[in-house]
Curated annotation (Swiss-Prot):
Top-level taxonomic group: Bacteria
Record region (Disordered): 1-24
Organism, scientific name: Synechococcus elongatus (strain ATCC 33912 / PCC 7942 / FACHB-805) (Anacystis nidulans R2)
Protein name: Large ribosomal subunit protein bL32
Short name of one Pfam family: Ribosomal_L32p
Residue intervals passing through the bilayer: none
Assigned protein family: Belongs to the bacterial ribosomal protein bL32 family.
HAMAP family registered for this protein in UniProt: Ribosomal_bL32
Stored PANTHER family: 50S RIBOSOMAL PROTEIN L32, CHLOROPLASTIC (PTHR36083), LARGE RIBOSOMAL SUBUNIT PROTEIN BL32C (PTHR36083:SF1)
SUPFAM superfamilies, alphabetized: Zn-binding ribosomal proteins
Length: 58
């Protein structure tokens, strides 16, 4: 079974974990911001299909 030759230092481990958490926090912040803009109707990046009465009856 393959095993690492040396133990990873705590500082390197913590640095990697901090990077991962920072990226996750940034993505969460972007998702929350996007959700808020969609709810308030300020989102410009989405194209909503026009709802015609003919299409809704089908």
């Amino acid at each position: 079974m393959a095993v690492p030759k040396k133990k990873t230092s705590k500082s390197k481990r913590d640095k990697r974990k901090a990077t991962w958490k920072r990226k996750a926090a940034l993505q969460a912040q972007r998702a929350l911001s996007l959700g808020k803009s969609v709810l308030t109707g300020r989102a410009k990046g989405f194209v909503y299909p026009a709802q015609d009465e003919e299409e809704t009856e089908e």
